[in-house]
Amino acid sequence: MNIYDQLQAVEDRYEELGELLSDPDVVSDTKRFMELSKEEASNRDTVIAYREYKQVLQNIVDAEEMIKESGGDADLEEMAKQELKDAKAEKEEYEEKLKILLLPKDPNDDKNIILEIRGAAGGDEAALFAGDLLTMYQKYAEAQGWRFEVMEASMNGVGGFKEVVAMVSGQSVYSKLKYESGAHRVQRVPVTESQGRVHTSTATVLVMPEVEEVEYDIDPKDLRVDIYHASGAGGQNVNKVATAVRIVHLPTNIKVEMQEERTQQKNREKAMKIIRARVADHFAQIAQDEQDAERKSTIGTGDRSERIRTYNFPQNRVTDHRIGLTLQKLDTILSGKLDEVVDALVLYDQTQKLEELNK
């Protein structure tokens, strides 16, 4: 199937989806309605671009016809030639855009995510920077209309985070934040530094797609569940009922502790969400390593230890080392305005995939 047949098939399906979504039987079936709505939304940009492309093709035909029928009118012929030139340039632009839109989509792109941030090298300063990153992602999520929920947090004595886990829910969350996994380095003068020297610290970020139970089934025999008395949030009934939950996946020794909620059941549900995502991510990493993973050939390994970005406070500079992007607007980015960085990473990834496809 050539590119034009693919595009026509996408448009035909889009029109079919429009009819289905107005069918009373579909509207009354919430699950099916949501699935079809999501499919329609995922094809919308492609269909809009394809329809605009077809109009450009018609503009070329019209301009060529005008040149033939100019009847010696030099001004009319000149105008038609300019229109033809512009339309042909537009045609090339649309063809590149449509190739990108037809690239195979990451099946996880529409998913919610589990976001883990940890203070790494640098002690208290690293923990404080982990808090800065948490705020950055939280503000970005708010701007996108996403829901941001802190599920688990371990703080240090100066208000930073040893580790914090959040759930980010909304439209296409993973597609935009999947490039954030890795080591984020900060260069700044810590508040505790009396000599004014710049210190370098690191916080690590891991972005994992949310994994539903039906998608990834963990054998209950592989889990050890411990119930104990909460020492933090949920402490109002700490002396009456043991509400905190620790779940260990025995084959990998991956563990999650949850005590943020006031009931054992809610803590258990949240802990299972996190451990399901971590275990699935663990085995996905192994599989990708064995296959010379896509993320190694495009934008890094996605590994927590790979340095991906530097935030330099004295120079108000952010550098993404994977794509050589440098922006002198650190304050803007840390305030949650991540679009310029995210868009550059998405474009780079798409370009790399397109080059691979054309080889």
From Swiss-Prot:
State whether keyword Nuclease applies. Answer: no
Q: Which residues carry this modification: N5-methylglutamine?
A: Q236
GO molecular function terms listed in the Swiss-Prot or TrEMBL record: translation release factor activity, codon specific
Alphabetical UniProt keywords:
Cytoplasm, Methylation, Protein biosynthesis
InterPro entries, alphabetized: PCRF (IPR005139), Pep_chain_release_fac_I (IPR000352), Pep_chain_release_fac_I_sf (IPR045853), Prokaryotic/Mito_RF (IPR050057), RF-1 (IPR004373)
Output a single Gene Ontology CC term carried by this record. cytoplasm
Description of post-translational modifications = Methylated by PrmC. Methylation increases the termination efficiency of RF1.
- The highest taxon in the source lineage is Bacteria
Q: Does the keyword Cytoplasm apply?
A: yes
Protein name in the entry: Peptide chain release factor 1
Organism per entry: Streptococcus pneumoniae serotype 2 (strain D39 / NCTC 7466)
Classification from the root reads:
Bacteria, Bacillati, Bacillota, Bacilli, Lactobacillales
